[in-house]
Amino acid sequence: MLGFTEGIFLVLTVTEFILGNLVNGFIVSVNGSHWFKSKKISLSDFIITSLALFRIFLLWIIFTDSLIIVFSYHTHDSGIRMQLIDVFWTFTNHFSIWLISCLSVFYCLKIATFSHPSFLWLKWRASRVVVGMLWGALVLSCVCTMSLMNEFKIYSALTGSRDTQNMTEYIRLKRHEYNLMHVLGNLWKIPSLIVSLIAYFLLLLSLGKHTQQMQKYSVGSRDQSAEAHRRAMRIILSFLLFFLFYFLSFVILSSSRFLPETKIARIIGVVITMSYLVGDSLILILGNNKLKQTFVAILPCECGHPKPGSKRFFAS
């Protein structure tokens, strides 16, 4: 019989799972149909579509893990099932994070304006820089996943072991090492976090300076343009906060192995992770001109607002 905590957790995960698939499925269907009709796709649309697709895979993996936590928690960390979930979760999550970093760099190079020679050199080669990052992200994700698979050699020695008086000190040490490697696995995510933070900071700095300059001439179309800049800054800040929120969830999930209430910590980490996969994708829709127009067009009622898309800071 499910307890109160497990029941609330199950309701939240089912809701987030459905919403996440709808939101990310919408992105894939809109960009995919446009790609199919026009036979071409912009780099930003390709990254956004790939990100949404990987997030759908990640939602299914996390939802499967959530069901195991609720209905069969005592077998959560045992057997080939755990290994498969860990491998697929690691690859899809790591590559998704790098896709976010690539998207932030692309927006930064396309939108921000700085006179530094190094920035201008990168700006003129924005597409090539981001494509190179995508290939590098794929390689790093594979390496990260392979390093995790090496951990299973340790895990195989621990299968069936329990904390009993007969357990040798060697087995205890190996189990601690296995858990520690899971925590240290978060170090693979630090480079992508640094890249994203730098890109978001530069983009906010550039938009902030440009907005201040435009406010001096806040009449007519320039006033509308300044307001569009402020909306873009709010979207970027939302991206950044959600991204930091996402990293917090993985710190909680990884550290849960060393916390007294392991199950509660995992539940909190999973809920935060799935919330991010829904919320951040919604921000992607609101920040993209084409996706936002299509989203508003399918709403069942008129909201009394003008059609979006007067300014295209995140449009493809």
UniProtKB/Swiss-Prot annotation:
GO molecular function, one term: G protein-coupled receptor activity
Residues annotated as glycosylated: 166
Cytoplasmic domain ranges by topology: 29-50, 108-128, 208-234, 288-316
Domain of life (superkingdom): Eukaryota
SUPFAM superfamilies, alphabetized: Family A G protein-coupled receptor-like
Compartments (UniProt record): Membrane
Family affiliation: Belongs to the G-protein coupled receptor T2R family.
Protein name: Taste receptor type 2 member 3
Native species: Rattus norvegicus
Species lineage: Eukaryota, Metazoa, Chordata, Craniata, Vertebrata
Gene designation: Tas2r3
